[in-house]
């Protein structure tokens, strides 16, 4: 009887492999398991994703996404500098009209302006407040238009409208004239008291400047073409009455179109 009893005691005292074994864990180990565990729901990640979605996209009343304006997105305005030479005969008008010239450059285009009397040039450059990449080019075109002889109010249209530019050509590009013949051609373009020039400007919706043998036209592409054709006809010798008639026809067509 002693042997079976001893055998049973040894079987009862032997530990079974199926029972769970308690393994001591330190506080650092528990923290590591929490940080790397991916089994449970990650509420913190979901909250961050919701915040990012709300910041990037909003919905309107119809449920359509509304994104932020992309005007200032991407790269900023590149630094640039332009120098516009001022002719000697335009220095006095520039000084007289200075209070009208610099406000659109500084307030609207956000440029920095400096007048260099020694070199007789106007310097423009971008700064941290400049928001438009085309501001420097617009400011340069505005100052150049004034130096060519246009009024400040007419040249300021270049800043407001994008499709305006200045075209320049000489009378000798149309027909070789010298001496009195050249003077008569200029007089035919201007007309008595400037009536012919004003008629061309009103019919074509442009501005024309007669600077000796050079002619500067400010306006849109189509409008400049109409004014140029009328001026070329006068240079070639067409009667002013015929040119007026053609301008009336063109003006009526433009009114019907617009």
UniProtKB/Swiss-Prot annotation:
Record GO terms (molecular function): RNA binding
Top-rank taxon, per record: Eukaryota
Alphabetically ordered keywords of this record: Cytoplasm, Nucleus, Ribosome biogenesis, RNA-binding
Comp. bias intervals (Polar residues): 7-16
Lipid metabolism recorded as keyword: no
UniProt region (Disordered), positions on chain: 1-31
Main subcellular location: cytoplasm
Record-level GO cellular component terms: cytoplasm; nucleolus; nucleus
Gene3D superfamilies named among the record's database cross-references: K Homology domain, type 1
SUPFAM superfamilies, per database record: Eukaryotic type KH-domain (KH-domain type I)
GO annotation (BP), single: ribosome biogenesis
Protein's cellular compartments: Cytoplasm; Nucleus, Nucleolus
Listed Pfam families: KH_KRR1_1st, KH_PNO1_2nd
Domain KH: 179-231
Self-association and partners: Component of the small ribosomal subunit, ribosomal RNA processing complex (SSU RRP complex).
Function of the molecule: Required for small ribosomal subunit (SSU) synthesis. Has a role in the processing of early nucleolar and late cytoplasmic pre-RNA species.
Similarity comment: family membership: Belongs to the PNO1 family.
Descriptive protein name: Pre-rRNA-processing protein PNO1
Organism the protein comes from: Yarrowia lipolytica (strain CLIB 122 / E 150)
């Amino acid at each position: 009887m002693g042997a079976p009893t001893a055998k049973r005691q040894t079987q009862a005292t032997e530990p079974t492999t199926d029972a769970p074994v308690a393994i001591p864990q330190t506080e650092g180990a528990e923290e590591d398991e929490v940080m790397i565990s991916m089994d449970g729901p990650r509420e913190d990640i979901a909250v961050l994703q919701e915040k990012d979605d709300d910041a990037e996209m909003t919905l309107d009343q119809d449920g359509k996404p509304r994104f932020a304006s992309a005007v200032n997105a991407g790269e900023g305005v590149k630094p640039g500098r332009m120098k516009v030479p001022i002719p000697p005969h335009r220095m006095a008008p520039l000084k007289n009209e200075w209070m009208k010239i610099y406000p659109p450059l500084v307030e609207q285009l956000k440029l920095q302006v400096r007048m260099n009397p020694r070199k007789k040039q106007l310097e423009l450059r971008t700064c941290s407040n400049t928001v438009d990449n085309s501001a420097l080019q617009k400011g340069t075109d505005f100052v150049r238009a004034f130096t060519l002889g246009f009024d400040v109010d007419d040249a300021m249209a270049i800043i407001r409208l994008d499709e305006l530019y200045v075209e320049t050509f000489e009378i000798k590009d149309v027909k070789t004239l010298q001496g009195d013949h050249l003077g008569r051609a200029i007089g035919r373009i201007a007309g008595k008291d400037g009536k012919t020039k004003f008629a061309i400007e009103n019919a074509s919706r442009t501005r024309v400047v007669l600077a000796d043998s050079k002619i500067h036209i400010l306006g849109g592409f189509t409008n400049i073409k109409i004014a140029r054709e009328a001026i070329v006809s006068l240079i070639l010798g067409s009667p002013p009455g015929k040119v007026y008639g053609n301008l009336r026809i063109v003006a009526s067509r433009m009114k019907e179109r617009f």
